Amino acid sequence: MTFSIVARSAGPDPETASWGVAVASKFLAVGSAVPAAVAQVGAIATQAHANVAYKGLALAHLDEGATASVALQRLLEEDEGRDHRQVGIVDVEGNAASHTGSACLDWAGSVTGDGYAIQGNILTGEEVVSAMEAAFLASDPEAPLARRLLAALEAGDRAGGDSRGRQSAAVLVVREGAGYGGMDDIEVDLRVDDHTAPVEELQRLLGLNDLYLTASTEEEKVPMTPELREELEAVARAAGHRDLEGWVGAENYEMRVAEDLSWVDRRILAIARGEEGAQ
């Protein structure tokens, strides 16, 4: 009833790596049950007749140094319901493992490779996981992991996805210090709990996440000159705010404008100027 991808970002350095899961299903709020990830540890998707305890157990095994395959073996050995489970795991190094129990409903299966595990059950066919793998491998390895995961999820959805229909989707990505304000490791945590086109809606939300919850790169920062400050102060007042700081706070642009107003993100500048497609 679900298809998912678990992956680690490209590159050998775990200090800058991301781990994540993207999932879709004809199931209410699939993001509350399937994905889990911890930066510098790994990620897991547990599905089919999901044993949600797998999430904490697998991450604990990985944190103790187990590889993905060893962690998976330990989960299955301790679970009498293993034949009804489907699970994918990627460890800190990008080693991947997947299991599809013999009692999972057709079509059910998986594929693994360097840095990813893709699995699904009650699918329209094997072409779903094949399309997901092809899309993930064709995506830019330097792109944000969330974008690569959603490219795979979207490909699986287009290929047929869950044979029962569509209802929910989610994406979870972790990277050390990547959270809001750098205060935690949650790079992306988005869920579409009940929607007629959940994967499409998840793509829309990821665009908003990039704008509001992702820090500006050095290339995106535009120095705040006196002339630019005057222009933006006028925009703020025209929008009914007392000043530029008030506008930034009201519009939730804190991640895209310097606290001391020494720079502004070029996307925010485009929005302020009303440029087409800026949002």
Please report, for each region that a protein language model flagged, where it lies by residue.
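A general structural motif at alpha-helix termini
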Residues: 75, 153, 236, 245-248, ...
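N-terminal nucleophile
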Residues: 1-226
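C-terminal soluble interaction/assembly domains
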Residues: 259-263, 277-278
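Short, hydrophobic-biased amphipathic alpha-helical segments
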Residues: 198, 264-268
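A short amphipathic alpha-helical interaction element
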Residues: 220-257, 271-275
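Short, solvent-exposed loop/turn and secondary-structure capping segments
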Residues: 33, 256-259
